[in-house]
Amino acid sequence: TVQTAASPDGKDIVTLNEYDSFGRPYSVYRPVPTQTSSGAYASFASINPELLKFYNWEVYTFSKTLYEDSPLDRPVEKYGPGSLWHTRGKSVRTEYLVNEATGVLSCGLYLVSSDTSLTRSGVFPSGSLSVVKTTDEDGDVTLSFTDRLGRKVLERRLDGDIRLDTHYVYDDLGLTRYVLTPEASAAMSSDGTFGDSSAPVAGLSYVYKYDGKGRCSSKRLPGRSPVIYKYDKGDEPVFSQDGRMRERGEWMFSFRDALGREAVSGIWPSSRTPDTDGATVIATYTGTASLGGYSVNVQTPAIGVPLSVNYYDGHSFLENLRLSDTDRLALSPDTLSAYGVPVTGSNRLKGLHTGSAVRSVTDPESVTVSAFYYDRRGRQIQSHHLEALSGRRHVHQSLTFTGKPLRTRETVELPDGRADSLVTSRLYDSQERLVSETSSLNGKSQTVAYSYDGIGRLTGRSYSSGDGSHSLSESLTYDIRDQLTGLSSNVFSMSLRRQEPVLGATPRYNGNISEWEWSRGAGS
């Protein structure tokens, strides 16, 4: 693979791939910058010297995959790049097995005996489950048990002689009913029936229930009260209730418009169970209804308290909200040409999220109203916010061709008349890597410059103030697997060690950190 002129200095980045005689991926080399920028084919003979030079004469600059001797072409061993892994036999090994009646390959058989109980009935018969055993570079073992329908029924992790089992239990329709955590699996390792109120199920397990249409009607997390869901005729979840809401006699509602967009959500203060299964609930914007300007085709939520309202397809909602002329003007678009010109007219705004109103849960009188404006490509370039406590906030941004923020201006107008303005300008290279970022707060600026190595890894950051009164530079280093190994500056430095610790820790080859050493200034 050749990425034409993709390196920071405009050179090609090449990744070599080798295949075995059966056409299977065998070796994948690390990317490397070349001396050309034409995008032409590069052979191994021409790239290998560049690999050695770029990766500090590392010989094993590739990952390697070995396959079993069968038509299934299943991988059995994989080495990542790096001589420490290849020469020390630190690979990821995969074995394909079947379950057994006893030992580490046995799997408990859990059945859903009723809507409110779970039964453990011995173990799965030998040979009825396929088992994939994965051993990582540090010898950590994971066993994944799958039934004949392709469903995972057990994931077992081994910590020495200790088994950490996560069981997945399905009903006759194939729906997930229970997920047993390792603690729950250990507590239910003997045969028996366990009700939903039993300690292992209620306190340590995930429990799911479904209605007659296969929709999740109740979900309970370990140690939590169940969350109940109610659906409409279109299978949309329109009401939900957790344990605290049941105590207060409340439901959370969420209604969508005819296009499936979330329109209004909030609290319905009622202890009775809503019945919406017979109708498709649709929120329609009228501008005068009590639910933030929306009306719905069911009666139950008419007295609901909206907490979040979303508006689409235009800005007519600003005329219908109870806003003063000053506030309405604050939410209108600006004409700052440096940040693009927002489009107007409902035909240009079809399908776009143009505004919102969010009410505080603790203070129902506190409402934040926002209006969003877009350019002719449908990209947001302005947002204006009327915030109950902090005043007004205006955000303008210009974008690159691909939509990355190029220049952003955020102004906050405080209730006491003060105003703060933060302007951020960004520069990108040809591959849209961030090269510099300059932020100016009320005229005082600071710049952060970023540098990259030949394959695009961040290798340096430099901070400087606009008046030159202070500056700071830091560098970052990586290993051959792109894992961060160090960060250094004149005020803080750190080293992350994995496979080659120097302070007596156990070497780690699977990516985990074995040692972290840091220093601040002259100390450590």
Language model feature labels by segment:
Residues T1-S524:
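Beta-strand elements of repeat-based all-beta scaffolds
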